[in-house]
Amino acid sequence: MIIKNKEVKDILIKCGWQESRTANISHYLDWYKKYNFKPFDAVPDFLSCFGGLTLRIPSYRYMKRISSPKNNSDLELEVIVNPAFFITDDFSSEDIIESKQYAKDIGDFLGIENLIPVGSSSEYEEFFMGIN
């Protein structure tokens, strides 16, 4: 994948990414199948480029503000590109149903038919891809 923005590219490279990166995503595809998610074409492409990486994204707020954050952890957001954090092996069947409904509800709210989990943050935020 070609990233044209130098600042974004530098951040990705610091996190272990490279333009020629092609990660083995078979375990992610197995996970989607296990939980009956139907990823569209862009999802495997995205995971092939970024799957397994932990991205440390600088907080734009503190890049532009004069004041400093209360905690150094506020200086960046850590995003783990791994859909399997959305539903883990220790989830009960009720947890799985609730998680899948949560993804559907978000998609419905945003007007997105097929919302697919792709990662999470250290702050327990989920990241999705979708098409509309």
Where are these regions (language model features)?
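Segments surrounding the PLD/"HKD" phosphodiesterase catalytic module and close analogs
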Residues: 126-132
